[in-house]
């Protein structure tokens, strides 16, 4: 499955999602250009100059404070892979879900009115 296919699929699966964040590097600009006309809410995000490890560390206090909730794997079995990647970071072969989590937590904590972020 390509990144375009994945974004299209997730957009169909979660039509209530207002923003779809796409990293503005590598093939991200081409994806943004292609999907912006097709899917509402496509937004570029920049990783900035910090390392992936530093970006992940910047949101760890939100997790440590108990302000992020994820579905139990019993109800959402697909969460297992994501949790494994988060917990095993940076020693996992893939870490795209870590980036996605960082962008989501940063965006939601900037906009959150209350202390709880629900996923």
Protein language model regions, located:
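Mg2+-dependent endonuclease catalytic cores in nucleic-acid-processing enzymes, primarily RNase H-like
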Residues: 1-89
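Generic structural signal for bulky hydrophobic/aromatic residues embedded
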Residues: 62, 103-104
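Short glycine/threonine-rich catalytic loop with a Thr-x-Gly-x-Asp
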Residues: 93-94
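P-loop NTPase catalytic core of nucleic-acid-dependent motor ATPases
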Residues: 100
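Acidic two-metal-ion nuclease catalytic site recognized across multiple nuclease folds
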Residues: 104-119
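Phosphate-binding/switch region of NTP-binding enzymes
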Residues: 97
């Amino acid at each position: 499955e390509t990144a375009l296919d994945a974004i299209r699929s997730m957009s169909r699966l979660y039509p209530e999602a207002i923003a779809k964040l796409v990293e503005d590097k590598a093939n991200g600009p081409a994806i943004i250009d292609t999907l912006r006309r097709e899917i509402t809410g496509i937004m570029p995000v920049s990783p900035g100059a910090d390392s992936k490890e530093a970006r992940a560390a910047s949101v760890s206090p939100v997790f440590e404070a108990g302000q992020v909730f994820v579905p139990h794997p019993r109800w959402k079995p697909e969460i297992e892979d994501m949790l494994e990647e988060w917990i095993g970071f940076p020693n996992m072969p893939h870490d795209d879900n870590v980036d996605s989590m960082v962008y989501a937590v940063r965006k939601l904590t900037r906009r959150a009115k209350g202390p709880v972020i629900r996923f």
